[in-house]
Swiss-Prot record:
S-adenosyl-L-methionine binds at L72, G103, L122, G123, N124, L125, T126, L127. It catalyses: pseudouridine(1915) in 23S rRNA + S-adenosyl-L-methionine = N(3)-methylpseudouridine(1915) in 23S rRNA + S-adenosyl-L-homocysteine + H(+). The keyword rRNA processing applies. Keywords: Cytoplasm, Methyltransferase, rRNA processing, S-adenosyl-L-methionine, Transferase. It is an enzyme of class 2 (transferase). SUPFAM superfamilies: alpha/beta knot. InterPro entries: Alpha/beta_knot_MTases (IPR029028), RlmH-like (IPR003742), tRNA_m1G_MTases_N (IPR029026). It is found in: Cytoplasm. It comes from the Bacteria. One of its GO terms (molecular function) is rRNA (pseudouridine-N3-)-methyltransferase activity. The keyword Glycosyltransferase does not apply. The gene is rlmH. This is Ribosomal RNA large subunit methyltransferase H.
Amino acid sequence: MTAPGARLRIIAIGRDSKGPEADLVARYAARLQPRPEVVALPDGTGSPAEIKRREADAILRRLAAEDLVIALDLGGKAPDSAAFAAMLASWRETSRPLAFVIGGAEGLERRIIERADAVLSLGNLTLPHLLARAVLAEQLYRAQCILAGHPYHRAGRP
């Protein structure tokens, strides 16, 4: 998925669950090469502003200077799967470790958006954060298949 030796991480606010969403994340993550590291960070506490600040602090501690950061945020671009695959191909060519960031219930603090190299949205629907992880993992797998010419992605199907 990324250049040889490059890391792929999904950094998400919220506990790791043992439910069906976690099963989906694990299923798609196992199909990815390299297999992504899924980092679950605790939810922040306090007022909404304090929650966002604490969650941003935790995320920033997990990011390295060389990471290519892709933040998932409602205000981001919502590419289709083919466009996402093209973006992934260009990011992979940088040989930088990729870090996809999913915020908590209050969203991502401005510092994370500013640190991001790209800001994407999974669409206008509101998703539970565990489901957002599963959707991201599936789209990463789908992008890998598109780039490899694998028939998993059937573009233009009625």
